[in-house]
């Protein structure tokens, strides 16, 4: 009688052990399956904008799309304020719509600095524009409600100013409209000569605007 109870207990223990092992194996297998998914990370740098220009409040109907420079003057110098516009074609990066931007940085080369430090604002443009854009036409464009990012520029030229624009580029990758950015400064200035910030345009052929994207797919 005692031996029979012992055998039954041993069999029950064996069944329990087997079931427990099988459950653990299933969970482990799921983790292995999840870990086997391939995540590709890469970097793409777009050198040169598809379109870039600046607009001048003091020359409201003039286009500067072929200029070698992108000139910016803060709003405090009105009516001589100037805005910069830049847009990049991301198709060369071939990032799938299922991918996403881990980081994205817009870089502009400040070839000539103002005499006072600027706080440059990069604001997403939400309607289409062309290289023939004028100041008057820029007033009819639509923009995001607030700047995507701001970057401080000093009083020394020959440096690059970087703008983190990850949230916008991630939207572009996922199918959002890509009309680039407006670069402006809402600060008060001294005068239109002292406060002129000059960036190199794509037409300059050197130190052109770039957009660097670290992404996953």
Walk through the language-model features, giving the residues of each.
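Extracytoplasmic/secreted cell-surface and envelope-processing proteins
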Residues: 97-98, 114-118, 189-199
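Short, surface-exposed loop/turn segments at beta-strand-coil junctions that are enriched for proline
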Residues: 8, 12-15, 92-95, 168-172
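Extracellular beta-strand ligand-recognition surfaces/modules
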Residues: 173-192
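Extended extracellular/luminal ectodomain segments enriched in beta-structured repeat modules
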Residues: 80-83, 93-105
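Long, small/polar-residue-biased beta-strand-and-loop interaction regions
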Residues: 1-42
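A short beta-strand element within beta-rich, extracytoplasmic domains
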Residues: 88, 99-112, 211
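Beta-strand-rich interaction/scaffold domains
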Residues: 45-50, 110-179, 205
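Flexible, small-residue-rich N-terminal segments that precede or flank a structured functional core
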Residues: 25-92, 130, 142-144, 186-193, ...
């Amino acid at each position: 009688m005692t031996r029979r109870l012992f055998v039954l207990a041993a069999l029950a223990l064996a069944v329990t052990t087997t079931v427990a092992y099988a459950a653990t194996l299933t969970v482990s297998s799921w983790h292995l399956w999840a870990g086997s998914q391939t995540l590709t990370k890469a970097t793409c740098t777009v050198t040169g904008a598809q379109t870039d220009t600046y607009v001048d409040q003091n020359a409201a109907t003039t286009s500067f799309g072929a200029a070698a420079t992108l000139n910016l003057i803060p709003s405090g110098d009105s009516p001589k304020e100037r805005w910069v516009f830049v847009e990049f074609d991301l198709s060369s990066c071939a990032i799938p719509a299922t991918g996403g931007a881990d980081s994205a940085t817009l870089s502009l080369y400040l070839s000539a600095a103002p005499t006072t430090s600027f706080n440059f604002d990069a604001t997403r443009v939400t309607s289409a524009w062309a290289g023939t854009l004028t100041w008057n036409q820029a007033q009819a464009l639509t923009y995001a409600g607030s700047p995507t990012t701001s970057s401080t520029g000093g009083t020394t030229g020959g440096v690059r100013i970087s703008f983190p624009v990850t949230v916008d580029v991630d939207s572009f990758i996922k199918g959002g409209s890509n009309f680039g950015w407006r670069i402006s400064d809402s600060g008060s200035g001294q005068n239109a000569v002292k406060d002129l910030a000059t960036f190199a345009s794509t037409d300059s052929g050197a130190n052109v605007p770039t957009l660097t994207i670290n992404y996953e797919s």
